[in-house]
């Protein structure tokens, strides 16, 4: 692996081997680090700043990224299954085709991330911010998405079946052909969203705000579901369904849980440290 240095950062230690040892600890700052294809299984990124890093196809199974900054980084086709990402900043990052199944990303910043075709089955993202994210074809079945910001997302053909999406903000999103079957949408805000071809079979919609939402082409909706939600004159529904008018202003509370304090790096011979050259 190459270990480039710059005026701002330098690698004090680096690996020449193809595989990076398990339980590696990485910290400090490294802008535009190249870690594509590396085996970083169980690695601990302890409050690190790895902005604009390239980790295409990297193995990060069970890695600890809590409190780190990976804004603008490329994780496409990477394996992050079971990774801990609480409170981390991934603004503008690319996770297209990546495996995030079972990952824990509560309170993470995922604004404008690309998750097209990603696997997030069973992932925990409570309190995360995915404003303007691209979720086209992503699998979020059985994921925990309570109090999450999903406003302005592009999520065509994504799978949210059996997901918990209570008290979340899905306003102005493109959810056409999405699978919401058996999902929990209680208290969620779907205002202004597009849901043509979306499947709501068995979804729970108690106190769901559908003002201005276009559900005219949605499938699996029943009057009993819609009767528990509320809307307005701009709400579009399938034929023969009616909705009661919302009273007052809908407020979605999305305060994320506090991120855990990153643990101290373990004592190990296999340590990568990135520090400022000052």
PLM features per residue range, with description:
Residues 3-268, 273-277:
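Tandem repeat scaffolds
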């Amino acid at each position: 692996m190459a270990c480039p240095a710059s005026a701002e950062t330098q690698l004090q230690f680096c690996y020449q081997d193809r595989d990076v040892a398990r339980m590696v600890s990485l910290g400090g700052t490294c802008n535009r680090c190249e870690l594509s294809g590396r085996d970083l299984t169980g690695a601990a990124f302890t409050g690190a700043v790895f902005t604009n890093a390239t980790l295409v196809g990297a193995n990060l199974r069970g890695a600890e990224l809590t409190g780190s900054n990976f804004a603008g980084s490329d994780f496409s086709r990477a394996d992050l299954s079971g990774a801990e990402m609480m409170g981390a900043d991934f603004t503008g990052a690319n996770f297209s085709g990546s495996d995030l199944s079972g990952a824990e990303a509560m309170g993470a910043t995922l604004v404008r991330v690309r998750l097209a075709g990603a696997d997030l089955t069973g992932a925990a993202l409570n309190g995360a911010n995915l404003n303007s994210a691209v979720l086209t074809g992503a699998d979020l079945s059985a994921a925990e998405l309570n109090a999450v910001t999903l406003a302005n997302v592009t999520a065509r053909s994504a799978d949210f079946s059996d997901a918990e999406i209570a008290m979340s903000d899905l306003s102005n999103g493109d959810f056409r052909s999405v699978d919401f079957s058996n999902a929990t949408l209680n208290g969620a805000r779907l205002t202004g969203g597009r849901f043509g071809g979306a499947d709501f079979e068995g979804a729970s919609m108690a106190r769901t705000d559908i003002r201005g939402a276009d559900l005219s082409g949605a499938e699996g909706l029943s009057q009993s579901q819609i009767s528990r939600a509320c809307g307005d004159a701009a709400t579009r529904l399938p034929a023969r369904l009616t909705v009661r008018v919302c009273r007052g202003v809908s407020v979605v509370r999305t305060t994320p849980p506090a991120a855990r304090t990153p643990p101290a790096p373990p004592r190990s011979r296999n340590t990568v440290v990135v520090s400022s050259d000052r």
